[in-house]
Amino acid sequence: MEIRKAYFHLPGLFEFYELYRVFLPLYRTHRDWFYDWCEIGSLYGAPADCLWGGGRTGCSRHTAREVLALAQEYGISARLTFSNSLLREEHLTDPKCNALCAQFAQGSVQNGVIVHSDLLVDYLQTHYPELYLVSSTTKVLTEFAQLETETARPEFRYVVPDFRLNKAFAQLDSLPQPQKDKLEFLCNECCWFGCTDRRRCYENVSRRNLGELCPEHRCTAPGAAEGYRFSKAMRNPGFIGVEDIRSTYLPRGFSQFKIEGRGLGSALVLEFLLYYLTKPEHQLQVREEIYLDNMLDLF
């Protein structure tokens, strides 16, 4: 019997290049330190000042050539996060974003684009058919009927649902296997489960990437002032943990899982890599290889 594997889509293709430059050699050399039921499906992100960018504001000192070379060296798909929801026709000719797509379209491993705007979907299909497309969670598809329609769209290889549908198994189980294969669940969202401002939050990022002057979105959710905490995310009703994946999602025919974190610090992203990919008995060894030595002072 074939064992179904989980594929993790990891944040910070550009933003956490330095972390992955150290982590990926460990993942290859010491594969026995990591769960054998999972693989790295992709790295996703975007450089700073991308007109088509969305979700989070990108930042990076590294070029597309550098990040692509790293991903290709390890046979990992690279995804551009171009999920701006407010694009207009005149934005489609942006030289920087087109140059990035042209570079990503040439990879030996097929690369992709995470997208929100249908205008951009049509443009990418016409001009860069080599790239696969991922429907972004920034669409905030909270109704199952919306999600079902989205997974039926042939232009998308994957669809990231709103995290509040993560546990809607009575409905998710009704999907045929080809649509189940498209679902890419956001595992570690810390956003308040009852949030009604999520779409406005994403639109604010889209406006800023377009260069529009607008006040920064201020989250008013309970506990927002403390920011992202992984322990808090684990208490979220939509959280998907390691045991959930192994015991619930994989047996049900779901295999794609997204880890958020582009706007966080690299230390926290490393904790995600340790929790989701690394066997508990080897997590300390990974820390020691990456940063932990006998002279490190925290205080």
Predicted regions and their residues:
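Active-site pocket-lining/capping segments in soluble small-molecule metabolic enzymes
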Residues: 1-150, 155-299
